[in-house]
Amino acid sequence: SCIDIGGDCDGEKDDCQCCRRNGYCSCYSLFGYLKSGCKCVVGTSAEFQGICRRKARQCYNSDPDKCESHNKPKRR
């Protein structure tokens, strides 16, 4: 149930939703707490790497495998 790039995402869940192609949920923040215009967007490589690491740590039902790193660490 990944969301296509440009698709609407839930700002309450912010980065915790799965967006296709290493995307993440980006919102406009109004007055620091109201979020609007939330869409799945493609970030730079550095942005999505950081967001994916945060997502893996913070999101309750996160699936870090959805963060397709270009340099995946080798499994031992």
Curated annotation (Swiss-Prot):
Omega-agatoxin are antagonist of voltage-gated calcium channels. They block insect neuromuscular transmission presynaptically. Potent blocker of N- (Cav2.2/CACNA1B) and L-type (Cav1/CACNA1) calcium channels. PROSITE patterns: OMEGA_AGA_II_III (PS60023). It is found in: Secreted. GO terms for molecular function: calcium channel regulator activity; toxin activity. Its main location: secreted. The presence of a 'disulfide through disulfide knot' structurally defines this protein as a knottin. Expressed by the venom gland. The keyword Disulfide bond applies. This is Omega-agatoxin-Aa3a. Keywords: Calcium channel impairing toxin, Disulfide bond, Ion channel impairing toxin, Knottin, Neurotoxin, Presynaptic neurotoxin, Secreted, Toxin, Voltage-gated calcium channel impairing toxin. Disulfide bonds join 2-19, 9-25, 16-52, 18-40, 27-38, 59-67. Belongs to the neurotoxin 04 (omega-agtx) family. 03 (type II/III omega-agtx) subfamily. GO terms for cellular component: extracellular region; host cell presynaptic membrane.
